[in-house]
Amino acid sequence: MPGRCQLYLAAPAAFPPDFAARLAAVLDAAPVACLRLPALPEAAEFLRFAQARDIAALLDGNAELAQRLGADGVHLTDGAEFAAARRLLGDQAIVGVHCGSSRHAAMLAADAGADYVAVDADLELVAWWAEVMVVPVVVELGDNIARAAEFAAAGADFVLAGAPIFNDPAGAPAAAAKLAAEIA
């Protein structure tokens, strides 16, 4: 039986001037388990912001910068970088790997010790993963945000949303709260 699915939030690739206020409003409106930030030096402010709220804060694709800024870990898009990231960040850091829609890549990442595997919005893959594997699976929703509840029901541990939340006409806080309620 699937467990409770949680919200994993992806920040925009560049921080707009009002991002601190927008992020605060989202984090106050919805239970966010993890925040992925672009690998930019300015991410330090938002790392601390999330960590002060007990939200894991990861950098996207740069383990060295993640270590330097004090991030909780790193999200990788290439499983070949996993071993180096783990050595650099240590066993206490979160190291997740995006695997697309490849079962094989996901199994390799899990076998290597990834803390989570992130997959594309592939319902069959998520259901299979939830049934046979123990490593948490993150579904990268992309524009499939309306299908989040389906992925949660299929066994996703986390759903990742970014632009559809921050660009929602109803406002990012309302969009995040709605998504969190749909997947709980």
Regions found by a protein language model. Give the residues of each.
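Conserved catalytic cores of soluble enzyme domains
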Residues: 89-90, 122-131
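Conserved residues at the C-terminal ends of beta-strands
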Residues: 38, 77, 119-120, 162
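Short, ordered loop/turn segments at secondary-structure junctions
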Residues: 62-63, 79, 121-122, 164
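C-terminal binding/interaction regions
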Residues: 158-159
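Catalytic-face loop-and-helix region of soluble metabolic enzyme cores
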Residues: 127-143
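Gly/Pro- and small hydrophobic-enriched strand-loop and loop-to-helix capping segments
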Residues: 71-82, 120-121
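Conserved N-terminal beta1-alpha1 strand-loop-helix module at the mouth
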Residues: 1-75, 88-101, 107-115, 134-135, ...
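Generic structural marker for isolated residues within well-ordered, non-membrane alpha-helices
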Residues: 23, 82, 126
